Amino acid sequence: MLVTEFDYHLPPELIAQEPLVQRDATRLMTVERDGGGIGEIPFRGIVDLFRPGDLLVINDTRVIPARLLGRKESGGKTEIFLVRRRPGDHETWHCLIRSSKPPRPGVTVLLPEGVRAVVREPGDGETWLVSFTPGEGFQEWLDRNGAMPLPPYIRREADAADRDRYQTVFARNRGAVAAPTAGLHMTAGLLDEIAGRGVRVAPVTLHVGLGTFMPIRVERLEDHRMHRERYHIPPATADAINGCRREGGRVIALGTTVCRTLEQAAAADGTIAAGEGEADIFIYPGYRFKAVDALITNFHLPKSTLLMLVSAFAGRDLLFRAYGEAVARRFRFFSYGDAMFIF
């Protein structure tokens, strides 16, 4: 398949630049895979779409304030973007560095509160290994001085409100540099209402990486190499998923990150084993889903791997018809936008 088959026209004014005042005040498009029906309800109405015996799987990753602004000792402005921590080393991170001159080993960047960032050596891809001194209490320092890593299509600087709103209400495990955005619509009250319908809620963790924003640089999908993201499935969640499937309930993924995690971990019969690993599965039309029965997701960028995943789940023709309806009805797109429930 060609990447160009997943392009569509999106008026720029439909890209949500701010979250709504209330998380669950967004709109929800409903997409029925069997009958092809497309509808619209307030997101709060999602409660009525659940059935007793369903299982809602959420991603409890927590976004770190990964953007740091500083100056080189020579005075030049420098932006450091934390990508991921080097395993076993609390002081050294894989980072992207933006400055007037290309980075080189030994360069020191002066950061707030006397912290220094020293460029060590090239990492993988476009990253550099950077050590932060003093490293003790680094996470607390980062919470005070880092900025939330808003996606590039949000054309403004992150502000104090984004520290709360670009984070799900169930975020627990630090490590993501982008939010699992389908979860941004959920409130504690909504989750309680869903549980009150006889629905279980179970977490997985997938630390969303920068690869979620990376464009596909090949013409054919089959030639694309997917990025890797760390995931963890607790034993209780694996048991809940396997029990739900045995009892005839639906496994409902809250977001593409949950979907990728479960499909990465699933055996051929859909059984899920607890554990951790790296998800590098690339899902596009033709893929047969083993673990996920319904999907809640936002609207995704043209020609993105996430759009291809959702096309595989809904069927490309139905999904693009739904996207056409969403544009015509002036839905809000991307991270701070509206959502759809595909079942």
From Swiss-Prot:
Major subcellular site = cytoplasm
| Keywords (A to Z) from UniProt | Cytoplasm, Queuosine biosynthesis, S-adenosyl-L-methionine, Transferase
One annotated GO molecular function is: S-adenosylmethionine:tRNA ribosyltransferase-isomerase activity
* Top-rank lineage group of the source organism: Bacteria
- Subunit and partners: Monomer.
Q: What does this protein do?
A: Transfers and isomerizes the ribose moiety from AdoMet to the 7-aminomethyl group of 7-deazaguanine (preQ1-tRNA) to give epoxyqueuosine (oQ-tRNA).
Q: Which NCBIfam families match?
A: PRK00147.1, queA
Protein's UniProt name = S-adenosylmethionine:tRNA ribosyltransferase-isomerase
